[in-house]
Amino acid sequence: MPFSLSNKVALVTGSSRGLGRGVAMALGKAGAKVCLNYLNNSEAAEKTLQDLRDEGIHAAMFRADASDQSQLNFMVEAIEDKFGSLDILVPNATPDQPQKPIEDYDADFYRQMYDFFVMSPFMLAQAVLPGMKKRKRGRIINITSEVFHCSVPEFSAYVAAKGGQIGWSRSMANELAPFGITVNTVAPGWIPTERHENDPEDAKNEYLKTIPIGRWGTPEDVGNAVVYYSSDEASFVTGQTLCVNGGRTPW
């Protein structure tokens, strides 16, 4: 089967719902054992866990704050103790992303964006790399966003942090390539999930008009991109960004 992830173990942070859930489901359907991560919404995490198991997927869930190094280290140790390895890392956890003028942001909010999108992948990588280097194989796929490529106004904290995440991924791709570890990014467009339930309908309609393919993307679309990057078929692909946005950024 192409893109088979049989016997691989994957961790997706922020995977109780939304894009993270879609990524977790796609990895599981490709054969991976899936480790869910959540912080507050245990009910949603339990539902996703049960949905995975209903599909015959070997899955477990772990509570940890994606911005806390000690909790991340403990989670990775628990996963490796339970499954014996951790082959695929998908940093996906995200805080709220309010859109507002730069004068209305404060420094703490900027730091929070940086903590989630640069520091969290860095801390997770430090935790998983010893095992990946020992096995001479690993996949790190950061979930970024099209906002960096589109220069969205009034999103400066989010755009800056996502730009840092992409730059970090490119540097790590070169550093880790000799060890058989690839580092890539998936950059979704605006994909309506639970997070966007209260977004204005007129804004959604205007955005939809800008998608050349003419439909909304889904969490499954993002998950399929992650499955590709996780596979052996993508072993010669590293340091790249795949925009999953229906052709909005064809460059």
Kindly give the residue locations of the regions a language model identified:
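Short C-terminal tail/terminal secondary-structure segment
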Residues: 99, 150, 209, 227, ...
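Conserved glycine-rich cofactor-binding loop
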Residues: 9, 16-18
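Residue(s) in the substrate-gating loop at a strand-loop-helix junction
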Residues: 145
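Catalytic Tyr-X3-Lys loop
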Residues: 103-122, 137, 141, 158, ...
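Short, small/polar-rich loop/turn modules that mediate ligand/substrate recognition or access, typified
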Residues: 84, 177, 182, 237-239, ...
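Active-site helix of classical SDR
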Residues: 125, 161, 169
